Every structure is written in C-alpha cells, then in structure tokens.
A protein has these predicted regions:
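Active-site glycine-rich loop that binds ribose-phosphate moieties when present
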Residues: 1-5, 24-27
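Catalytic cores of soluble, metal-dependent hydrolases
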Residues: 16-126
Length: 126
C-alpha cells in the first residue's frame, strides 16, 4: 500500500500508479496490454512485492494488507510480461518468522519460477 503523497511523487516521475482497488473483480490482461504498449522494446525490471498479494494467499510478510491481489492476478501480471525485454527482476518482502504455514514461501517460489519462464529467449511449448 502506498500513500497518496508517494503515489503523486511517482506520477511526477512518469510512473503509472495502479491502486489495488482498481484491480478488484477483474482480469489484469487489459492492464498488461497497456503496459506492453507503453514499454515497447525498452528494458523492464520486474519486481514483485509479496505484500501486494492479499494475506489470505501470502500471510508471511511484515506488512500484510487486506484487499491485495489474488494469485491469479499475480500470474496474469507475470505472464503478461512474456516477450518483453526483461533485464532483471526480484521478489521481496517474504518474512519467514511470519510464514508459519510455509504458504508464503511456496507462493514466492512459484512466482519466481513463473518470472524465470518469461525471461527473454526462454523457449515455450505450443
């Protein structure tokens, strides 16, 4: 979650800010199509912050916020990056002391795997 002050600062720097509420109850495929069009062939750094997911999916973080993205939406974002010029990426904010069930680590590992699958030059089966 970010404050409106942080969001306005990011907008001034040219970032597009999408609040979680704008993503509720919908596919993120149209958003990813717009991002792909805007990014073109430019370099992309893909960063996933686990606390952007709803804590029902990933409770093991220091800053859980209800109303976050679903697992399916996170996958739409990552898979929507296929074919883009990804130059790096990361997944942050998993906190093992708060991950009592291990679910967050499992979600994080799967999302990292998905991120590796969309790197340039990865071969896909049809």
């Amino acid at each position: 979650a970010s404050s409106s002050c942080e969001s306005s600062g990011r907008r001034r720097q040219g970032f597009r800010v999408v609040q979680a509420e704008e993503c509720w109850y919908k596919s993120l495929a149209p958003l990813m199509a717009a991002i792909r069009a805007q990014a073109g062939s430019g370099p992309i750094y893909l960063s996933i912050d686990i606390d952007g997911l709803d804590p029902s999916f990933a409770p093991g973080t220091g800053t859980p916020e209800i109303g976050g993205l679903t697992i399916w939406q996170a996958l739409e974002i990552i898979r929507g990056c296929r074919g883009m010029n990804i130059v790096g990426g990361d997944l942050v904010e998993i906190s093992p002391p708060y991950d009592l069930s291990g679910n967050t680590a499992l979600v994080g590992a799967n999302l990292l795997y998905e991120m590796l699958c969309v790197l340039p030059k990865v071969q896909y089966r049809s």
